Amino acid sequence: MYLSTLQLGAFRNYDSLTIHFSPGLNVLYGDNAQGKTNLLEAIHFLATGRSHRTSRDPDMVQEGREELLARAAVVRRTGTIELELRCGLQTRKQLKINGIAERKIARLVGSLAVVLFSPDDLQLLKGPPSGRRRFLDLELSQISQTYLHHLMAYNRLVAQRNTLLKQPVIDEGLMAVYDEQLVETGAQLVVRRAEAVRRLSPIASRYHRMLAEDREDLELAYQSQGVGDDGAADLETVRRRLERELARLRSEERRRQVTLVGPHRDDVGFWVAGRDARLYASQGQQRTAVLALKLAELEFMSEEIGEPPLLLLDDVASELDPHRRHYLLSAVREGVQSFITCTDLEDLMVREWPADHRLFRVRAGTVVLDDRGLS
């Protein structure tokens, strides 16, 4: 798949903009605070319905304007898809797919798939478990609408159950219904996440060995109340484990008035050279592990959806040493549409540009195709 055209109106610092991209490599370069990251944010917004930088959609609306527009033409193996999102300061998001209004924004997810690697991702290992869960959820939601449906239902259920736990008198009948739904829906999420981590681990390990020049191994493991030490994660086993945990922690949940059982408590373990990278990894080891994970994500999603997602690299060249930088760019293989932002083309250390590349100079909300990038 690739993004052939991006159109923006009143999006961040872009008043009105239309860009035609290469199906291969697209480099967005220019000084800081000119709008490079805003372009990647717009692509991410069209892929997921959300910004990767803010939880408030109105933050993306240009100052002094009431509503933003983001529109894209996405070329898939099955044909071209036209996506359109509008969002206002006082109005909810509105979605059209191929000109037809959709009631649910979730219908957008999967039409355009992306893998984003930004400097913030370098905190994935040392940050809280919520970031690692979010990584899995975004990946799997783009692959499967069924997973996204289960995730949304589960999040609503946990919120409702937490509200019930805060009541002075708990409706036991309603709690029993919530418990049953939590076990069923939660087990679906645990099984799919555990399977994804099981498949990601050897792929990430392969990339990690190359990046670390065979000095260290990387291993991933999904850590869940629903998965035992033996790693068993079939649906029935996970259900039974969640049921047991609910019974064991029932009094503690009521004392603390919060749901303590379920996939919203899970984590992903990273081990580098046999040591827990979340606790002991150096900054260099963190960078290598996260880079290996992102390359594994790209490969895994390509296998799952039958074509590569877009790769968005936001100013990561400045965060990587020359060896990792060179490996990352060489790993951007043919057939993957890539978007790279940087302040200076020299930062990329590219000796020879591929034939299907385009260079765009970004300056104060304008984007100009560089003559060196005509292809």
Swiss-Prot record:
Q: Which InterPro entries match?
A: DNA-binding_RecF, DNA-binding_RecF_CS, P-loop_NTPase, RecF/RecN/SMC_N, RecF_2
Q: What is its main location?
A: cytoplasm
Q: Which residues cross the membrane?
A: none
An example molecular function term from Gene Ontology annotations: single-stranded DNA binding
| Positions that bind ATP | G30, D31, N32, A33, Q34, G35, K36, T37
* Any one GO cellular component localisation term in the record: cytoplasm
Q: One Pfam family for this entry, by name?
A: SMC_N
Where, per UniProt, does this protein localize?
Cytoplasm
Specify whether DNA-binding is a keyword of the entry.
yes
Query: Which HAMAP family has this protein been placed in?
Result: RecF
Name of the protein in question: DNA replication and repair protein RecF
Question: Gene for this protein?
Answer: recF
